[in-house]
């Protein structure tokens, strides 16, 4: 029951949007702790190589993809409030558990001190045992993290559909989706400092603990718009302005589960269009997220150095500033040109798909200055974030509210498969290329730089290919109509 009685429209929907932004920021900071500590801290202790790290990130992506199949259904069944709390508590717990991997490894291998651990001869049986055990322990923690984190975007997209009319959803999604960039932006300024001064273990514990605070705030602040004491009638009317909104709300209230079964979702071309958009492009962002610190370290600027932190910070600053405009362009097409939301989003996504093409020039120009690949990857990442925000919003354009989280989970699963392939493939490729040295070449690059060149080329063209396939599957606006 709404308790706000003023005639002036409240703007509580933006408070909720801010909470989604904070959750996504925490989500990505938890995910970034490993990428910012493995090369300079953890690998030194546990004798990891690129392939070991690639395995950990790939398995995380695989489980993230698999659990995403059920995360959307879980959010639909549990409800947004409880479901979101469960998700963030689980992933925060998983983040904190990473801190114990070193202690368990030392205990099992009967190693008495950090100095003894680091002084183990590289390539020895003891080093292999330490590396293998620690990788398995980190994998277990990453799986717990993946289980919780897989619920973030299905829940956030469902909340956006509940609190925003269709014309504003891309903007709201752009704002909370920018939390990914802000989380990645804040991470290099905080995590290496924590790891340097307090140990890499405390960086996992401190960053992971923030999620528990968010869960307490969500418990107090969130309720459905029609039940929220902070939303007045004017704002509720604005939220429900779309045709058929009221009827959909009533049907959703009556329903105990999505009106589309899991298998029925795959019968629609709209589902496959969303799947293709995620399958082609999600792994690109995850590659930038997981490998950018290691890439700059290869250029001679580790994340523990001031220059390394500056490069990563500026990269994600570019992403953050530019990606926030991802929701404005389709809104302009809808309001100024009179296009339907889907057509406006697809036109905007085509424009955003050209930004990642810059990635092809990151490696060839890296010898001039590290700032060149920094700026290029930032532009490509901004294009991804703008693309992703609009891609998520196409679900609300096409599907009934009750199925939004399920469709989001399906798409996220396929996006996770792309991330698995890119991260595992990258780790194997970089280790292989590094071993061959000058004997491995691609487009004028040799050794490990040639490996990076190969991955950057895929990152560059993935969006245009994905857009063409999506357009072929759903050429015109066609929402799902259930009989």
Residue ranges and their predicted role:
Residues 89-131, 350-367:
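C-terminal ends and interior cores of transmembrane alpha-helices
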Residues 141-182:
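Cytoplasmic helix-loop-helix junction between adjacent transmembrane helices
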Residues 180-229:
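Helix-loop-helix hairpin linking two adjacent transmembrane segments in secondary transporters
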Residues 214-222, 226, 357-365, 452-483:
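Multi-pass alpha-helical transporter architecture, strongest
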Residues 34-36, 265-324, 384-388, 392, ...:
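Extracytoplasmic gate region of multi-pass secondary transporters
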Residues 32, 61-69, 150, 184-185, ...:
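Residue-level signature of mid-helix packing/kink "hotspots" within the transmembrane helices
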Residues 342-390:
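C-terminal transmembrane helical hairpin of 12-TM major facilitator-type secondary transporters
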Residues 84, 138, 346-349:
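Primarily marks hydrophobic transmembrane alpha-helices of the MFS/SLC 12-helix fold
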């Amino acid at each position: 029951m709404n308790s706000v009685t003023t005639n002036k429209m409240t703007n509580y929907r933006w408070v909720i949007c801010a909470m989604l932004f904070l959750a996504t920021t925490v989500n990505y900071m938890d995910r970034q702790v490993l990428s910012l500590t493995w090369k300079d801290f953890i690998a030194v202790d546990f004798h990891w190589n690129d392939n070991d790290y690639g395995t950990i990130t790939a398995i995380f992506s695989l489980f993230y993809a698999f659990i995403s199949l059920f995360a959307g259904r879980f959010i639909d069944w549990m409800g947004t409030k409880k479901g979101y709390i469960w998700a963030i508590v689980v992933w925060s717990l998983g983040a904190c558990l990473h801190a114990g991997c070193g202690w368990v490894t030392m205990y099992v291998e009967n190693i008495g001190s950090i100095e003894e651990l680091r002084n183990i001869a590289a390539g020895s049986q003891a080093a292999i045992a330490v590396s293998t055990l620690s990788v398995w322990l980190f994998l277990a923690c990453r799986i717990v993290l993946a289980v919780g984190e897989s619920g973030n975007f299905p829940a956030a997209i469902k909340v956006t559909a509940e609190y925003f009319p269709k014309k504003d959803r891309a903007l709201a999604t752009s704002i909370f989706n920018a939390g990914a960039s802000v989380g990645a932006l804040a991470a290099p300024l905080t995590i290496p400092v924590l790891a340097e001064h307090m140990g890499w273990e405390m960086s996992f514990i401190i960053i992971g603990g923030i999620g528990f605070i968010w869960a307490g705030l969500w418990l107090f602040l969130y309720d459905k718009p029609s039940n929220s004491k902070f939303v007045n009638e004017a704002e509720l009317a604005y939220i429900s302005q779309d045709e058929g909104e009221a009827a959909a709300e009533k049907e959703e209230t009556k329903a105990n589960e999505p009106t589309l079964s899991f298998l029925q979702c795959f019968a629609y071309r709209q589902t496959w269009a969303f799947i293709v958009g995620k399958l082609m492009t999600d792994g690109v962002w995850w590659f930038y997220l997981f490998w950018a610190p290691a890439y700059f370290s290869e250029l001679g600027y580790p994340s523990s150095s001031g220059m390394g932190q500056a490069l990563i910070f500026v990269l994600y600053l570019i992403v953050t500033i530019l990606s926030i405009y991802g929701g404005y362009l389709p809104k302009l097409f809808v309001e100024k040109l009179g296009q339907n939301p889907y057509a406006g989003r697809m036109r905007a996504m085509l424009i955003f798909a050209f930004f990642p093409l810059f990635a092809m020039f990151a490696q060839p120009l890296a010898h001039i200055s590290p700032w060149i690949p920094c700026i290029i990857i930032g532009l490509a990442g901004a294009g991804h974030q703008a693309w992703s925000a609009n891609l998520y919003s196409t679900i609300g354009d096409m599907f009934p509210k009750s199925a939004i989280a399920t469709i989001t989970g399906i798409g996220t699963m396929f996006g996770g498969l792309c991330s698995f392939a890119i991260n595992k493939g990258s780790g194997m490729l970089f280790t292989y290329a590094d071993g061959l040295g000058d004997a491995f070449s691609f487009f004028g690059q040799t050794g490990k730089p040639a490996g990076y060149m190969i991955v950057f080329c895929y990152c560059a063209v993935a969006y245009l290919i994905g857009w063409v396939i999506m357009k072929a599957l759903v050429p015109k606006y066609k929402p799902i109509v259930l009989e």
